[in-house]
Swiss-Prot record:
Residue ranges of the motif 'KMSKS' region: 241-245
Superkingdom per UniProt: Bacteria
Renumbered ranges of motif 'HIGH' region: 51-60
Gene Ontology biological-process annotations: tyrosyl-tRNA aminoacylation
Gene Ontology molecular function: ATP binding; RNA binding; tyrosine-tRNA ligase activity
Annotated organism of origin: Bifidobacterium longum (strain NCC 2705)
Enzyme class, spelled out: ligase
Protein name: Tyrosine--tRNA ligase
Catalytic activity: tRNA(Tyr) + L-tyrosine + ATP = L-tyrosyl-tRNA(Tyr) + AMP + diphosphate + H(+)
Amino acid sequence: MAHVTDFKEAGFNTLLEELEWRGLISQSTDRDRLAEALNGEPITYYCGFDPTAASLHIGNLVQLINMRHLQLAGHHPIALVGGATGLIGDPRQSGERTLNPKDVVAGWADRLKNQIGGILDTEGANAVRFVSNYDWTASMTVIDFLRDVGKNFRLGTMLAKDTVARRLNSEEGISFTEFSYQVLQGNDFLHLFDEYHCTLELGGSDQWGNLTSGLDLIHKVRGVDVNVFTSPIITDASGKKFGKSEGNAVWLDATMLSPYKFYQFWINRPDVEMESLLKAFTFLPKAEIERLVEESKTNPGKREAQKTLAWEVTSFVHGEAATQAAIDASGALFGRGGNLEDIDEEMLESVLDGFKVVDENGEHVFPVSKPGDRVIDAAQAAGLFKSASEARRAIKSGGVYLNNNRIEDEEQVLAEADFLAGRFALIRRGKKALGAVENR
């Protein structure tokens, strides 16, 4: 696929023009001032990532994509992993965050750095710089904080921030800890401005109030107008935010969501979302995206747009090798090429996870089968048939497969060699109905 290295190759006159076309900017400071900053000499910009979980998610991915666009244009990125703010957590729309132990937060911070470093360039003239706000916040006394930082914030302005206002009007209210978050984030921007002449902050649209805290602070104490812009919040089909606190997170860490499942998330997006997702989540040129969108309208059954989207985003996050392995595993699973025996155990477990059944305790598990068990019994256990007689009829009609091999004998039993990686046997009914049993 034709990747681009900057906005000109993508078919745009300026970087800001490209970001706006891709729908990557929700709100910003004065557009002319922002355009002048982005189109001039390289600037230093930053985005903050709080380690409130062990992984980033696709809501954060939008920020990383924006950072990557700016990095490709020659600007200098700073990734702030919030060692201090991560101990507090920014206020949510509802409910206080659980405070995590310091050692847990520190471990999560290291994991986030590794994820970010896998996406942004870590070498070269504009390599990403990692900083932690714990380094300049932890040593600050309460008196210093109140005198040097807090003195510059007006309570009326702080109370008017959207999230704060909502929380104040709710039953649970808001703690002083979370209320103070915007002051800490504002101080972060000031520190990075002083230390690295950082003049632009990026964030999600739900962070607008926190971003403008730094904007106002720098204007007040340094007399300089800096810039901020936010990206839109990604939502699911019901309009709910995709995020780690919403229970349906699409994680970027391969140990928390496998590349296979990550790929499946993108390839299963509906046609109506193709234009916005291809624009926002890929680096394909404008002309190629427009072609794919048109193709999805005229030939939706081909699903070229979905396949391209899934490949582009998964390879961006997990690399091409892991993405190809996920595609090969999917093809092998349905007998569309590839060899089931070539899939490693970790990938197998991930691929087959959706074929678990609910046991008597309400747990999702793989049904158990052993060498010597009949295939028809294993197929029933996997939920493919309601009775042995139904399974027998399907075998007679040639519609039952064990590891993609048609079953001819109604009394065939599972052999040791039928368990892939020594654990899983895949049973298929027809072309699409799949089940799996585990030897344990």
